[in-house]
Amino acid sequence: MGKVKIKRKSTLIDMTAMSDVTVLLLTFFMLTSTFLQKEPTVVNTPSSVSEIKVPVSNLMTVLVSAQDPTKTDVNTEGKVFISFAGDVDSVWSSTNLRVAVLKEAEKLFEEHRGKKLNLTPMQYAEFSKMNMFGVPFENLPALLDMESTKRDKFQGDMTNPQVGIPIDDNKDPGKNLNDFQIWLQAVQNVAQDFRSQKREAMAEKGASEEEIQNMESLYKSLIRTGEGIAVKADQNTKFEVVHRVFDNLQTMSLNKFSLMTALKSEDEPKVTTNEGE
């Protein structure tokens, strides 16, 4: 009796479909992921149970560093930095927002200090690419002229007295604005101007009032709801320093803002919303 021969099957497998799925998944994650932005210093936020997530667009972040443990700097209590993130569309992207705020801050600095920065187009372009900055206005041109790695190293030196945006206890929003308050006023002016321009443009196209309000994302986030203002302070920073930041925000009529925290069981930053009285 003859043996039954088992037909050999090919071990080759067509992986075309699997490769297509892999490429699609990789593309999806690349497009939807939010990359962590570089910050001048590591800030360990305090813990809380809040699960409100920080927005990724139309956001102004105020970072307050920890105390200088070496006590070698006159400002050992913590230094202030600012970053701006615009909308996801090309009309009011982070690049456009940063340049607009810088130009407005330049005008306000001249108005309140009687000095001109005389920034160049190249310096505007450099500022538009910066995620976070923290120097007095007088040192801003020199900072923008630095090569990026040298700039990061310069701002990362928490013992340098030239690092950190100057802030004080000024309560008068009409005059004698400190550097921090000038930036706050600048971003408000930009949000107001952009709101007016957008309202006029949409009204001409026949948009309804509801549609217009839905498009006021920058103004709504920064001024109306305060969702777009986040204070990120180190858990070891003195309360007086953080409170001074809060006072300055309220002096400039930014009474709604968020304090970034970390969940006790997670490391992802969350926020606790605070509203000034």
Predicted features by range, described:
Residues 2-8, 204, 273:
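Generic cytosolic/nucleocytoplasmic N-terminal low-complexity/intrinsically disordered segments
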Residues 3-40:
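Hydrophobic single transmembrane helices highlighted by the model
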